[in-house]
Amino acid sequence: MTTPHVPAIHVQSLEKAYKNVGVLRGVDFDVARGSIFALLGSNGAGKTTLVNILSTLLKADAGTASVNGFDVATQAADVRESISLTGQFAAVDEILTGRENLMLIARLRHLKDPGTIANDLLERFALTDAAERKVSTYSGGLRRRLDIAMSLIGYPPVIILDEPTTGLDPQARIEVWQVGKELAEHGTTVLLTTQYLDEAEQLADRIAILHQGRIIENGTLAELKQLLPPAKIEYVEKQPTLEDVFLAIVGDEGKDLPTLAMTAASAQKGEEQR
């Protein structure tokens, strides 16, 4: 059931309605093992409902879905053993340290040597320096990284990142993006739900656009770009965005400051040539 030929997630003709209002209207997609699959849609598109069905928290009205080869309706216990769900609300205990949070989850899952498990995850997610601090002192980015580390205890083959960067500042978002990429590099299958276009573009191997309860497009970034008309060559003056300015100022030891200066200089030169 869990051979490489079987998709990590398989969804077929999935439907769900609330009081005769269709939320999911025949959703179909597959997620390949070890890949990052982005489910892109605005608020109300049906992303959360779909995640709740895949994580066995909600039953579909019609259609089928499987995770790691297990049917979400008839093999719910096996599905729950195969996945971990984390998102915009970090499920951490603020009165405990980072290490204590990790060890607590390892003990609750009856795993051997919780201390070693915690140390390995602290190192993997660059949390060693913050390991002995109470989580109440953590920044948003640190909390999110700890939450994702906690979700990997027990090594679930599939992790669902549900709106993982909502409410984070630009630097913390980039930190979470890096964690997502590392998960896939280690063989974990990642289902990412997001409403941020840049997030899907940066992370996903494939992107499905969910709109009004239906998948209206599904493909790689290159395939989706082919849906647009042929590109036209235009000469424009590009000014740095506020995010460019922010990251240039607070980047690692100011290494991006020359980039900001070059961007401004290039823009000025382009204006002079025009």
Could you tell me what each predicted segment is?
Residues 159-163:
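Catalytic Walker B motif of ABC-type/P-loop ATPase nucleotide-binding domains
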Residues 84, 103, 107-130:
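Conserved ABC ATPase "signature" region
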Residues 218-219:
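ABC ATPase "signature
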Residues 63-74, 78-79:
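Conserved ABC transporter NBD signature motif
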